[in-house]
Amino acid sequence: MSLSKLDSEKLTIEDVQTSSSSCRREINTTTYDDYILSIQTSEKQNQEHFVLTFPKTPMPDKKKRSGPSELEVAVPIQVKRKIEKDQKPTHVWINQFLRDIFLKSSFSRPFITQAPFKYLYNPQNHYTMAESRKSKNDERRKTLKIKFRGKISSCVVNLEPMRTITNGEPEILGNTEKNPSKSSHKIKLPKTSNSTSETNLEYNNSKKTLEMSLRNGNKNSMNFVLKGNAATCCKDNPNTDSKKSVEEFSDDISECINSSNMDLMLRLNEFRAEFTDLDVWSTNCSQNNAKKPLKTGGKKERDSDIDSGGSKDAKKEGKKKGKRESRKKRNTESSDAESGDSKDGKKKSKHDKKNEIKKKKDTDSTGSGSGASMVSKKGKTEKKSTGKKSTGSTGSESVDSKSTNKVKKQVKKGVMKKAVSTDSESDASSKKSKKDEKKENKGRKKKPIKDTESTDADSESEGDSTGKKNEKKDKKITKKGEKKDAKKNTASSESESDLGVNKKKTKIKEIVSFSDSTSDSYSKAGRRKNVRRSDSESEDSSGFRVLKSTDDSEASSTDSKTGMPGMRRGFRSLSKKTTFNERGKRSVTGRIPSSRERLPFPPCEPFRASPKPVHVCKCKESPSPKARYAPLPGVEWIHKLL
């Protein structure tokens, strides 16, 4: 063994002995951990320094498809933002600074920069959020807002748009103040108006004056000077320089910037919206409060005219009333005629249907009663219509004109009633004929044949009672009855032919079933089939179809019941009780038919053993042929090697 191996073995033994001590273990672990941490920190610092000093230029053609590298993960987001800010040009710095001033958020700037990721939970984040919310309700913030409002009101010129209402038209006092840019630029306090109609216009005069200046295009009234990345609020003096204004109002500028400038921008927009609303309100208020011209004078003049020319007005009114009464009479008469015709037509159609239904049911008395009721009801309706016509007429008309009008109307009504009755009768007859045909088609199989001779007699008796109007109805009904008789006779003949065909079919089926059964079963079960045949014939005569076919299975079951010819039907033959001596024997009561007999099993073949394979000796086998190769070329040294 070499010396190096011996030294290594000694060292390992000493390490094992000393490793058990606690002091040695602590020293080793602490020093090793510190060494690793120092190396890691130095490597990270070197990497960050290298990235900051020598940034990689991105290639135009290539795109990064891989995930973030270790350097990007190591560098925090706050450091990246600082690097981006340092690399921005000056004009970007200026624009960003102005944007931050005028569009300042409710949260502070350091809170936004130092906030961690949104999706990570951090107790510091919640703590800072709570502090920022508390700062809104702070008293210091309220005091700053109050001071800022006071300074804005001092810087704005008051236009004093005093308005008065005379005869519903608003007028603006002080023509010199219509164009405030030309007037003297002196600061005036807002004045309150004493008029009752201008109560809502007193609300926030400072807001109103500011909006008036912006609307009329007075850019000099509120000059926002942007210099040194700061916003300043100047007076309306156009001759003053921006530098002087900045120097004079430096204290005001600092306070304006510290307070929320976002509130100012929002309020400017609110002022514009409120100003338009005030204009609309003022116009509406002026229109509503304006005195309207009274209409009593016109009425009085009319009354005086009526009093002066009373005779003329009386004549005109009398003529107008006469015309109106004549028009009303005509309208009432036409409406009465139409309503009477429609009612009579409906009543006739209903009564016609009722009469036809009653005739089918063979009720003579009810038919005559309904005809009488129809005549009485028609008389009542005619009386009512004549009564209405008589009330429509006035005392001014003569008696002769009444009688002539009534005669003409009655003639017209008679013509209209006849036309309506004929139409209703034709419609009802067509509908009922269709329904009757459907019912007859359904009732051919179920309903028995009925005689309809009585209906013809009933229709004739009712025709005499009702008169000439009902003669047409009776003729139509008689024709319908004749058609129904013909149809029912044909239906009855068809049903009888169907029953005869069905009887023939049942007889043929029974004969076939007898021929199919064997001769043995026929001799024993002949009585039962004869009985069934007589039953089926009796049932066919009553109108019902009964088909009973007998198979071989039924014949075999009847053989067991009718064992001996001397035994009566209904009694079973008692089967013999088996004993231990007759265990192998079995009592055979009936004979099995030839169709049910089982074929005998084929004879069993003798068992044959499988043939043994014949083994041949290998010595006697012919040797396997040797492999043949292609002839080698004629080279001597190859032959020598082989």
Swiss-Prot record:
Biased composition, class Polar residues, residue ranges: 191-203
Name by which UniProt lists this protein: Cylicin-1
Record's function text: Plays a role in the establishment of normal sperm morphology during spermatogenesis and is required for acrosome attachment to the nuclear envelope.
Keywords of the record: Cytoplasm, Cytoskeleton, Developmental protein, Differentiation, Repeat, Spermatogenesis
Region named 8 X approximate tandem repeats: 527-543
Record bears the keyword Repeat: yes
Biased composition (Basic and acidic residues): 298-316, 353-364, 428-440, 465-488
Amino acid composition bias (Acidic residues), ranges on this chain: 454-463
Phenotype upon loss of function: CYLC1-knockout male mice have decreased fertility, resulting in reduced pregnancy rates in mating females and reduced litter size. Knockout spermatozoa show abnormal head morphologies and varying degrees of acrosome detachment from the nuclear envelope.
Extent of the Sequence repeats: 294-313, 314-344, 345-391, 392-432, 433-464, 465-500, 501-526, 527-543
Subcellular location: Cytoplasm, Cytoskeleton, Perinuclear theca, Calyx; Cytoplasm, Cytoskeleton, Perinuclear theca
Tissue expression from the record: Testis.
Chain spans, region Disordered: 167-203, 284-607
Organism name: Mus musculus (Mouse)
One MF annotation (Gene Ontology) recorded for this entry: structural constituent of cytoskeleton
Any single biological process term in GO: acrosome assembly
